[in-house]
Amino acid sequence: MSGAELIIQEINREAERKIEYILNEAREEAEKIKEEAKRRAESKAEWILRRAKTQAELEKQRIIANARLEVRRKRLAVQEEIIRNVLDEVRKRLQEMPEEEYFESIKALLKEAVEELKEGKVRVYSNERTLALISSRIEEIRDYLGSISIEIGSAISTMGGVIVETEDGRIRIDNTFEARMERFEGEIRAKIAKVLFGG
């Protein structure tokens, strides 16, 4: 074999070695890229999964919170309706109170107002039924109240009770059933709620 052929063979071998080296480098790089891509894909998949779980949990909490609010709203609506019905029944019973019981109630309301006004002469307003009852039993009321002069005022629109004012009309105590129920409605509601709903 001539010297030229030997040189050519050596060149070919060197070229093959270089090609093999380059191919190995390329394969390794490709493997690294594949591994990195796989790692990134897995990492992204985990992130997507975590985000989906977080969103699902948030949605679950939102649905539960909304459901609780809806239950509470419906419970309060039912509670309010029951309380309203009870208050309506109280009003109805006050209007239908037997006369003797009603008279005792009027005496107590008059006494409360007179004691608050601290006046020797007062004027009383109420509906026609109540004014007629007071007029027909005025002596009994005077005995009950003590040395108080009572003037019967004009009839007003009320389901019961009395308005009592000083002779000059400057101070007025509204002891009608409506006014008293309005004043004590919060307390009445709380009592009804406690009895019916335990709080």
From Swiss-Prot:
It comes from Pyrococcus abyssi (strain GE5 / Orsay). It is found in: Cell membrane. This is A-type ATP synthase subunit E. Component of the A-type ATP synthase that produces ATP from ADP in the presence of a proton gradient across the membrane. GO terms for cellular component: plasma membrane; proton-transporting two-sector ATPase complex, catalytic domain. GO terms for biological process: proton motive force-driven plasma membrane ATP synthesis. GO terms for molecular function: ATP binding; proton-transporting ATP synthase activity, rotational mechanism; proton-transporting ATPase activity, rotational mechanism. It is a peripheral membrane protein. Keywords: ATP synthesis, Cell membrane, Hydrogen ion transport, Ion transport, Membrane, Transport.
